[in-house]
Amino acid sequence: MKKRVFAMLMACVMAFSLVACGSKTDSGTAGGDTGSAETIKLGGVGPLTGGYANYGLSVQHGAELAVKEINEAGGVGGKQLELSFQDSQGDPESAVAAYGKLMDWGMNVCLGGVLSGETASVVAAANADDMFIMETTGSADKCIDGNDKAFRVCFYDSYQGTAAADYLKDNGLADEVGVLYQSDNDYSAGLYNAFVAEAEKSGMTIKETQTFTAATATDFSTQVNTLVASGVKVVFIPFYAEEASTFLTQAKGKFADDVYFFGCDGLDGILGKVSQDVTIADNVLMMTPFAADSTDPKVHAFVEAYKATYNATPDQFAADAYDAVYAVKAAVEAANGSTSGADLAAVMTSVTVEGVTGTMTWNADGNTSKAASAILYKNGVGTLFGQDSAADTAADAAEGTDAGAADAQA
């Protein structure tokens, strides 16, 4: 996928610079070296400013927390981890200059990009540097194509789209579905294509399909009216929270109360986008490998540590990044301390990581598969689908108390 044309590849190499995690520029070892005597340098790239900054900051924070924990526990083979993260502003071209800074700094292992577009650029550039990539959240299928030293911890889009259709069918949520997707975005279009193929195979009907582009993402009135008129009970919305917040704001009060809006990992952070009225996100279902309210001890410890450090609840972007750093640790240990891209890639298919997003093993294509669940948002609270949220439980209790008081007065 990445070797389409030499000029494109060179453009990617320039855009790839956004893979770093800090602002230091320091000359050091090249990506294929085993690092300095005392440190292993990790670099990552993502949007720390702009409309997608919530994703980049989550990834940065999740990675920082893992680095801190690993270093406090003695590091990796006696070496400390050092992390640098660079701002891509969500732009693939900007992402490339950052990768160059990281290489000058002496990056040994790359955590890739955050958004799919910048990730593809980073992965292409790293191919020429013997750089091992443990991609955090770039999910488009093509993101890691053409680079046999690139692996990822996140869901990939065709898996997500297929799993989304299966989830709706298996949980009896819909036989007829409406779809709204962004036709000029690889992430959204990839999810849409995989979802439709699996939905049709499982006997579901795509009753209505609507599209939008980056240029039309401010006015969803036509799409809302058309989807409402279709009478569907589920609308599949495979796009990012930034655009979803606009759509849901304009859709509020138009659909019946029992209609669900089902999305994938790009919806994470939706509550922050509708903080002026969190009920805008009511009935949003988001597929995820991570639930912050999980009772799993590993997840609970991660959530509490993240809250204590950043005064916020981690989302799956933070969780994926946290797991990515631990995956790097496992790979370096399996490779007897080497950070060579070839050495790390050679051991990756034999590595198993018990992470906060699930148990992960990797195939030769660099992909991992993890169990998927869904979070339901209601009254500003997200809970695993099928469980009552704390907000609903409190509301139900209050209603019961009020009803009891009314009966007593009567």
What name fits each language-model region?
Residues 1-41, 72, 389-410:
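Short, low-complexity disordered leader/linker segments with a strong preference
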Residues 26-33, 54-61, 73-144, 212-218, ...:
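Beta-alpha junction/loop-to-helix N-cap segments that form part of ligand/metal-binding clefts
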Residues 193-287:
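Extracellular/periplasmic bilobed ligand-binding domains
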Residues 102-114, 133-136, 178-181, 231-241, ...:
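Periplasmic-binding protein-like
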Residues 251-322, 382, 388:
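Extracellular/periplasmic periplasmic-binding protein-like sensory domains
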Residues 150-211, 234:
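An alpha-beta-alpha
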Residues 309-318, 329-381:
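Segments of small-molecule ligand-sensing domains
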Residues 35-36, 40-64, 86-92, 115, ...:
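Extracytoplasmic "Venus flytrap"
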